[in-house]
Amino acid sequence: FKETGGILATRRNFVTETSRLGLNIDLIEISREESVEINTYEDWWIANNYLRKMKIAFVVDAYDQIGTGHMYRCLSMASKLVFHDVVFFINRNHQLGIDIIEGYNYKYQTYEGKSDLLGLFEHFNPKIVINDVGNTSYDYMVDLTSRGYYIINFEDFGSGSDLADLVFDSLYEHESDDKFFVGHEYYILKDEFYLHQPKIITNDVRNVLIDFAPNDTLNLSQKVLDALLASGFSGRINVILGSGHENYDELVSKYEFMKNVQFYTTVESISDFMISADIIFTSGGRIMYQVCSLGVPCIVICKNEREERTLFGSPEHGFVNMGMGSYLSQEDIIEQFNIVANDFELRQ
């Protein structure tokens, strides 16, 4: 055996002029973090980062009814936490979320029910728990706070939100206390949008994007598409339906003979579709921030009353907001489209 500078435990009677090793020798293996030996400033930097390293749990889901926005927001946050131990916790019944996380180099665990999730937390012992699952229950949050976790929630209007240490809500601005951070300033933009320059507005409108995914319960995709076709628009129309659209087969079969209409269930990079569009029809959800970041002219049609309450989708931020989609006629949509399409200065 050869001494390597590590910590050596021995007995007094084994210490001689030529050796400190006895006959019964064993090695105690330590972790990489514990084995850092500080000899240089670089070693000191590494050791300092190990000491600051935290265990962070992301509780997040993605499925047809809620889409993938929650998952990609957490992935964006995780990409900035490279010096910490990050683990995603995903409901095993939501395969879409599992499929997404498997495409990234992050550890994840699946659970079924609250008790299963809390058991995984007991083993992982996170310092911070980030919930991006919408509304949380009071009982769930009590279980987390009783374990001493620091809790951060996103877009939580549930009964458990008051027990969180921080709550971020970029979409629905409202009066709140000091631990609630609301407004568009707190929206986390997907990394792909930083790769694009702002849209260059042209005189002609040749490409329209329709995106009411993932939960188009009012079938606004077809309503807008029918209006565009009735208006005489002959340019390209891309329609993103999402993987869970109930009328997908019906829509495709109805319009498959039209060469200028293309349907998509999922897309690799939504920003590419947006930047290529001259006008976008979409809902009053988080997608508004993505459109705004690119500067593409946008007509907002709300899918529910909650979207109607959002303050961001207004002319002040460059949007034409038509309100609740269920109240709009085809003529209303045609009229508004023609106004936007024919007014170059308005689109600028």
Locations of regions flagged by a protein language model:
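Conserved core of the sugar-phosphate nucleotidyltransferase
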Residues: F1-D26
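A nucleotide-sugar donor-handling region in carbohydrate enzymes
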Residues: N24, I28-I46, A164-N219, G244
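Donor-nucleotide binding loops and adjacent catalytic segments primarily
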Residues: H94, R206-S276
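Active-site donor-binding acidic/aromatic loop of nucleotide-activated sugar
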Residues: Y111, K259-T266, N321-M324
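Short hydrophobic beta-strand element within catalytic cores of glycosyltransferases
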Residues: I280-T282, P297-R306
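Conserved donor-nucleotide binding/catalytic region of nucleotide-linked donor-dependent transferases
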Residues: G325-Q348
